Amino acid sequence: MTGTKSFTRIAASTAGGSAFHDEEIPLDTSLAITGLPSMLTGTIPAASAAVYVRHDMSGAPHPAPHNAPRRQWVVMLRGIIEVEVTDGSRRTFGPGDLIRAEDTDGTGHVTRLVGDPPWEALYLPG
């Protein structure tokens, strides 16, 4: 059995802004833990330890554009955020969504809380 896990990559555009890209991680059947049935697994390359973030963005009325501090995976755990890239495109992300933030240069992107606070995410540098 095989499959894929979809994720959104946010990368710097050639015009100096940011843009969304839809991508997938291939999944294959493996025996991850002895005693449990086989499951679909995939690899997410990470460079170092993960960072857990919990934030109540309700006090930020007008979020400013910002860059990703480094290339990183963002695993949404709780809450719903909206990310806007330079061309005005917006996407919402919630629990279970996977984002690859790569726009370390240029204008960056805007992140807004659209659900109830707080939101929680796990950041994996890589």
Predicted regions and their residues:
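A short glycine-rich, His/Asp/Glu-containing loop-to-beta-strand
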Residues: 14-64, 117-126
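A short beta-strand-loop-beta hairpin characteristic of the jelly-roll/cupin
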Residues: 67, 73-94
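Short acidic, Pro/Gly- and aromatic-enriched capping/linker segments at domain boundaries
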Residues: 1-12
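A generic structural motif
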Residues: 11-13, 84, 112-114
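Short, Lys/Arg- and Gly-enriched loop/turn segments at beta-strand edges
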Residues: 30-31, 91, 107-113
